Amino acid sequence: MALEMYDTVKSTEGRLLAVPKHGGSAEEIKSLTPVLSAYLYTSAGISVGNQTIKTALDTLEGLTMQRAEQTVALRSAVTTSVISKIYDRNGSSETFSVPTCVYIDLGSHDSEVVRVNEYGWSLLSDERKIASDSNQEYPAAPLFRRTATIRPLPVPVRSTNGRDHLASILGLTPTDPKFLLVWGWLVASVFVNIPRPALWLTGQQGSGKTTLGLLALSVVNPTERMGGNFGKNERDDLTLLSGS
């Protein structure tokens, strides 16, 4: 029954996930008990004990463990192209990857995703509608999963002064070095395939650090609380950042 509703995936981190066949974000297989219980009751009028469903899901996890690993993103994903470029007269070259598209999961109930590239941004739902109307293949997108801390982002709207407006909301000016640091951090935060800088906010108590931080975070990943404080040494800081 579960396989009629979901495809199963093993992520590169070893997570065993179920992906709705009609589209949507990946979920932990072990979290499907309430969904399957409700489905059985509404479709067949029967009530099955949790232990029975747990046994079935354990079996499904065992089968999924045998699958090849697949990349599953959290909030954002980056697709890249491999390029070889000639660097010297001897013809030696270096192969490197450059980002082609950034995908951002809005965390909404309809699984909306924003695709960003050098030409701008678009909603995947709009792209798929255009593809459907013209009988073309749907644009592919990375597979996303969500955690309990993932909160929805608003659907973006086009604006000619979005950067200036954000600076005003943060209580800064567009040319303020502080705003430029925040802006750079926001842009870097979605490039999950490379090391990214941390944003440390310092200042006296009551200077607005928490408010500024929460407002900045709300652009890419809304949350009710800030991250941790400085550690005792660099190793503590790196440990904290690696889990954020």
Residue ranges with predicted function:
Residues A38-T42, T55-G62, D164-S168, A188, ...:
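Charged/polar, solvent-exposed surface patches and flexible loops
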Residues S242-S244:
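Conserved P-loop NTPase "ATPase switch" module shared by AAA+ and STAND
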Residues S125-L238:
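P-loop NTPase catalytic core of nucleic-acid-dependent motor ATPases
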